């Protein structure tokens, strides 16, 4: 094996060893053993919320351990591939070296992707995520764009086998949604998806324009950590106004004959939260309270860091505040304006192929925090 390839393998070994240490491989095995014990409890599904959390974390942790173990196996096998290639002659030798080089390139990409997980060390990074999408400038196209984004994130979660719980969907009159709030129930979902926060811009030929003109639309994505019982977010009963109404579907159609939908208004802050996707008023109230607690936790966190005013100044779904651009016409390109990461296949991205953008965003955030 030539010195350059030896150096590449040694560098990958160093990176993977660091990843194994940070992820605590033995700790992962112990955690899996504990979760498997919980999952075997015959009464686990008596509490569906707990059951969902346990099974989701177990699946995630098992996948994480399998990923690291597989990377180590592949890295250990790589020198053997080059040794076997050296025993070949002529065209067979060239083919064997090319095969080993392809594995080296693939392994480097996979180790670097796994390394990104070690960068999720923020205070709330290991939490589940609460995602809110709001349509911005662009009329019916913006409402349709907001719904496309919602589908994109749900497809991403489904591809990773992460459960999604939709709390509220406010439909627009003609098409699309005004807003939606949903939770992604997976460890580190917040740390991963928080880089998606900001304004997303779509450029396309409008399907709602009789003259088929090009339209620019905006939608805003907000990502919060799901509140846990240890967060101590106390909300006095008198600080919250509760309004009930009938759930509505696309076009404003009523989908429920009872007043099961709930709107909570936090009077001191003016924060308004709605929930209409559960079957009963009580379930909707509980779900809405979870969302309100998450928003108040984020508000408290930002105030403690003296960032609230700066973030408000940066807010709004408009041209000047976009973080990613999705162009479907006159060319096809999705480009993150912070990281410069781009993909020429918008259809794949909108179908949930987001990992490249998420990894680039996490690395970008980590570099920013180090500066």
UniProtKB/Swiss-Prot annotation:
Domain of life (superkingdom): Bacteria
Sorted UniProt keywords: Cytoplasm, Methylation, Protein biosynthesis
Family annotation (InterPro entries): PCRF, Pep_chain_release_fac_I, Pep_chain_release_fac_I_sf, PrfB
Residue ranges of coiled coil: none
GO cellular component, one term: peptidoglycan-based cell wall
Cell location: Cytoplasm
N5-methylglutamine modified-residue sites: 253
GO MF term set: translation release factor activity, codon specific
Xref: SUPFAM superfamilies: Release factor (SSF75620)
Keyword Transferase: no
Primary subcellular site in the record, as a coarse category: cytoplasm
A Pfam family that the UniProt record links to this protein: PCRF
Keyword Protein biosynthesis attributed: yes
Free-text description of this protein's post-translational modifications in UniProt: Methylated by PrmC. Methylation increases the termination efficiency of RF2.
Cross-referenced PANTHER family: CLASS I PEPTIDE CHAIN RELEASE FACTOR, PEPTIDE CHAIN RELEASE FACTOR 2
Family assignment from sequence similarity: Belongs to the prokaryotic/mitochondrial release factor family.
NCBIfam families: prfB (TIGR00020)
Other facts: Was identified as a high-confidence drug target.
Summary of the function given for this chain in its UniProt record: Peptide chain release factor 2 directs the termination of translation in response to the peptide chain termination codons UGA and UAA.
Name this polypeptide is given: Peptide chain release factor 2
Gene it is expressed from: prfB
């Amino acid at each position: 094996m030539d010195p350059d390839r030896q150096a590449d393998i040694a560098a990958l070994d160093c990176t993977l060893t660091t990843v194994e240490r940070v992820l605590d491989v033995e700790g992962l095995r112990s955690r899996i053993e504990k979760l498997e014990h919980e999952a075997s409890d015959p009464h686990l599904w008596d509490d569906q919320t707990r059951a969902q959390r346990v099974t989701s974390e177990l699946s995630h942790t098992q996948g994480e351990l399998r990923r690291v173990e597989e990377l180590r196996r592949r890295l250990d096998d790589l020198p053997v591939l080059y040794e076997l290639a050296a025993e070949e002659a002529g065209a067979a030798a060239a083919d064997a070296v090319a095969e080993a080089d392809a594995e080296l390139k693939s392994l480097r990409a996979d180790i670097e992707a796994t390394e990104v997980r070690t960068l999720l060390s923020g205070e709330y990074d290991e939490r589940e995520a609460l995602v809110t999408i709001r349509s911005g400038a662009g009329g019916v196209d913006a409402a349709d764009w907001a719904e496309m984004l919602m589908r994109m994130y749900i497809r991403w979660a489904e591809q990773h086998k992460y459960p999604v719980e939709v709390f509220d969907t406010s439909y627009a009159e003609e098409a699309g949604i005004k807003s939606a709030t949903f939770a992604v129930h997976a460890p580190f979902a917040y740390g991963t998806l928080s880089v998606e926060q900001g304004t997303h811009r779509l450029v396309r030929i409008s399907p709602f324009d009789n003259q088929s003109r090009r339209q620019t639309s905006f939608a805003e994505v907000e990502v919060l950590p799901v509140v846990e019982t240890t967060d101590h977010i106390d909300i006095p009963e008198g600080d919250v106004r509760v309004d009930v109404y009938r759930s509505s579907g696309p076009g404003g159609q009523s989908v429920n004959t009872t007043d099961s939908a709930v709107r909570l208004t936090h009077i001191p802050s003016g924060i308004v939260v709605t929930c209409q996707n559960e079957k009963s008023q009580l379930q909707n109230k509980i779900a809405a309270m979870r969302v309100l607690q998450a928003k108040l936790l984020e508000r408290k966190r930002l105030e403690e860091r003296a960032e609230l005013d700066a973030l408000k100044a940066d807010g709004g779904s408009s041209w000047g505040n976009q973080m990613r651009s999705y162009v479907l016409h006159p060319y096809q390109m999705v480009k993150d304006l912070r990281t410069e990461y781009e993909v020429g296949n918008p259809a794949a991205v909108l179908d949930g192929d987001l990992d490249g953008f998420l990894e680039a965003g996490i690395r970008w955030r980590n570099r920013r925090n180090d500066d």
